[in-house]
């Protein structure tokens, strides 16, 4: 295995880190996912035309799982795209400041192996937190009857975006001298892509949206998530 990945795992996935990160991810994910799932599974409010009163429709676990999917995807993005990007930038800046980066350049490794080691070794804890959410994703796919092709397409773009953001964070860490500043600069860049780009898209500037997961989500997943609800009406 890549020695930089091994070093990242040993430094950032010690027992105390595993317990803390695992509990944080599990509690947060289970709370968000189950809240959205149970709310959606109870059924939608339907107007009774005879009594003019609102009543809940039939319980639908499928609808609950589909409603929870978006919340789960957002949480996974928070772990890898926000926390992971900041981690890569901060540790890169820290190692550059301490001189460890110069030492790594002298090791007998090709550039591709070094970059791969940094991309997957530095955010090892965030990848572990993402892995904790995978059972919830599996439940969502099975109960929600989601298309495997659409899910694989979405997560292929998801991980491509994660690699792009982490590469950008690595460059920011090499340029910005302070670890904390590098971390927040990289996180603000990611936030800008998902907060400000939709506004630019309404103005006709949609080119940068292809740096995000928004096109496959709105183009493939969202129509499937709302298709059952549309058919009910």
Predicted regions and their residues:
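Long, hydrophobic alpha-helical segments
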Residues: 68-94, 98-100, 111
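Residue-level hotspots within the lipid-embedded alpha helices of multi-pass solute transporters
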Residues: 91, 126, 158-162
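Hydrophobic alpha-helical transmembrane segments that constitute the membrane-spanning cores
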Residues: 77, 111, 115-145
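Residue-level signal for the membrane-embedded core of alpha-helical transmembrane segments
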Residues: 76-83, 131, 159, 163, ...
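Hydrophobic, aromatic-rich alpha-helical transmembrane segments
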Residues: 63-75, 115, 119, 123, ...
């Amino acid at each position: 295995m890549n020695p930089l990945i091994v070093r990242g795992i040993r430094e950032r996935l010690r027992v105390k880190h595993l317990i803390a990160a695992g509990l944080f991810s599990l509690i947060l994910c289970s709370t968000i996912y189950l809240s959205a799932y149970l709310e959606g599974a109870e059924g939608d409010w339907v107007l009774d035309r005879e009594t003019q009163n609102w009543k809940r429709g039939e319980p639908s676990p499928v609808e609950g799982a589909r409603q929870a999917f978006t919340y789960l995807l957002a949480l996974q993005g928070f772990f890898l795209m926000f926390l992971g990007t900041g981690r890569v930038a901060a540790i890169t800046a820290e190692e550059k400041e301490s001189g460890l980066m110069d030492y790594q350049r002298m090791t007998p490794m090709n550039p591709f192996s070094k970059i791969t080691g940094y991309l997957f070794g530095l955010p090892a804890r965030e990848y572990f937190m993402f892995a904790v959410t995978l059972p919830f994703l599996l439940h969502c796919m099975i109960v929600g009857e989601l298309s495997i092709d659409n899910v694989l397409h979405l997560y292929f773009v998801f991980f491509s975006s994660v690699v792009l953001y982490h590469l950008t964070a690595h460059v920011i860490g090499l340029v910005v001298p302070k670890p904390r500043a590098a971390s927040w600069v990289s996180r603000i860049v990611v936030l800008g892509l998902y907060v400000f780009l939709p506004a630019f898209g309404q103005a006709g500037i949609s080119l940068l949206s292809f740096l995000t997961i928004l096109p496959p989500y709105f183009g493939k997943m969202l129509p499937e998530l709302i298709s059952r609800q549309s058919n009910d009406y």
